[in-house]
Amino acid sequence: ALEQEELEDKEEGLSEHPELAHLNQDQYEIDEVEDEMSKRSAIYGKIEIPDEKEMKEKTRTLDENQRKVVDIVVKYCRSVVKARQPGNSLPEPDHMMVHGAAGTGKSTVILLCAQWAQKTLVTAGSDLDKPLLLKTAFMGTAAANIGGQTLSSTFSMKFGNEYHGLGDRSRDLKRRAMENLQILIMDEISMVKADMVYQLDLILKEITQKHKKAYGGVMVMAFGDIFQLPPVLGRAPFREPQDSQYAMTHAIEPRWELLKVLNLEENHRQGEDREFADVLNRVRIVEKGKLSEEDLALLRTRVRPEGHKDLENASINIVC
């Protein structure tokens, strides 16, 4: 499917620039604000594009549901590129919630979606210092795992549920830095409270200046597992927000319901990790007191008394 679409695009003259070259900044006069904007743009990071053959090989290893997510992203990005031609209009964003338990390959899908989006959207004259796609997560560890940044640092989000808007200078810098933004990836969506979803909606509108478009016309891709614990001091992202500031928007067009749900179901882990992940996935959905004796026995093998030497090198300890 990807190969066929590439041939069609080449016929329309929409193939990407072979060098993916930066604009020649020497041609432009850069004032103080633009210089600071450029420095801040670098914070968002660049998405490295591997050899196309390698990308295609990795894509072929995806299961059916994983591939469906990547195909949606590629199709959307190709439509965005085609919309740059006279007479064509921008496509409506395919907002989605990619839901999957441990081991279903969410991180792999995020990586490939980012790479294919970058490869497809970058054409001759693209400014690679301005992100086309941003990878974010609620917590710093999760953000680092996907090569991204936290939501709060990316969009200068403040604590609390009320939306105060960006300062004049911050707004100007973000508008310049993110003027080419097409896709926003949010990992560990279960940690994002409902009010934060609506704050993000308003921030993106403020940045893109597309106030009538949900999420400012940016395609939002949420990844995670809603069976995990809800946000601390907040409602789950699919619930009604607490702050009355978002009540009308929630009543007319709930932002969560704009996300098309795509489920990743296949466990891709191997050996003991796969077996343990399967048990954890069953724990997520089983009724209280209904876990099998086999699953309980496996969980008991992971129990250690306080002070045990195994705890010294354990990355995560659960205490009860």
Whereabouts are the PLM-identified features?
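Conserved ATP-binding/catalytic motifs of P-loop helicase motor domains
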Residues: 1-320
